[in-house]
Design a protein with these regions (language model features):
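Divalent metal-binding acidic/histidine catalytic loops
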Residues: 1-187
Length: 187
């Protein structure tokens, strides 16, 4: 991978990820699982920009196909092209104030389950983020967004408790921004 051409998107927008119907690729599935595990750690610790791609690919760890390997190579090429990008934290004028964004990706084609995604920031730096398949099947995008809102609210409670333990009591309500008018109206 040392001599590969770098790319500037972690996942090819034209690729269609679906379950492998051609059978196992043998011992290569262990290599795939190892790569996914290492890239998941990187997405969690330092590179949230690959979290979405990693979330999708991790679903195919048990039985990957060549398309899934191609997608992992795309992520590695992306990391090579963006090697100087990472998280940096600076002094925040008001560290006890954090806010968040949430979204839901409605009903994937494989299991018809939606994905909840959120990111919370202190100042302009991400302090926590997540992307998780919802356990239920949402019938409407508004329902999927409302589930994401609920899951993000749990993260808010955890962050407020953590900040309180660190001596930073957040007196104001936590701002959580979403893009679905129906779920906002229900909240």
């Amino acid at each position: 991978m040392q001599d590969v051409n770098p790319v500037f998107t972690p996942l090819d927008t034209n690729i269609k990820l679906e379950p492998n119907s051609e059978g196992s690729v043998g011992d290569q599935s262990n290599l795939f699982a190892t790569l996914i595990g290492k890239l998941q750690y990187l997405a969690t610790a330092m590179r949230p920009d690959i979290a979405f791609a990693m979330n999708w690919l991790a679903a195919y760890t048990a039985n990957p196909s060549l398309i899934h390997y191609t997608a992992v190579k795309q992520i590695l090429r992306y990391l090579k092209g963006t090697i100087n990008i990472g998280l940096t934290y600076q002094d925040i004028p008001s560290p006890n104030i954090f806010y968040g964004y949430l979204d839901a990706v409605f009903a994937n084609a494989d299991e018809y389950k939606s994905t909840s995604e959120y990111v919370f920031l202190a100042g302009n730096a991400a302090i926590t983020w997540g992307s998780q398949k919802q356990s239920m099947i949402a019938l409407l995008s508004t329902e999927a967004e409302y589930v994401a809102l609920s899951e993000s609210s749990c993260e808010i409670m955890w962050l407020r408790h953590l900040y309180g333990e660190l001596g930073y009591i957040q007196k104001e309500p936590t701002v959580l921004l979403g893009d679905n008018n129906g779920s906002i109206a229900m909240a």
